[in-house]
């Protein structure tokens, strides 16, 4: 039935109304969440900086070039 197909949508609407309506509005307005105005606003709302920090991996004293392995 038609009601059975819509029940997951109503369930999500009841459980998380703000996120559901936000996702619905962004879908209706065809907003791309990766575009700069929307992305910077979302980052500001979450408290995340838009710039990235350099990642430093620990190499345990080994060189960062190609390494050979042997498979038995």
Curated annotation (Swiss-Prot):
Highest taxon in the source lineage: Bacteria
Family: Belongs to the UPF0426 family.
Protein name: UPF0426 protein asl4034
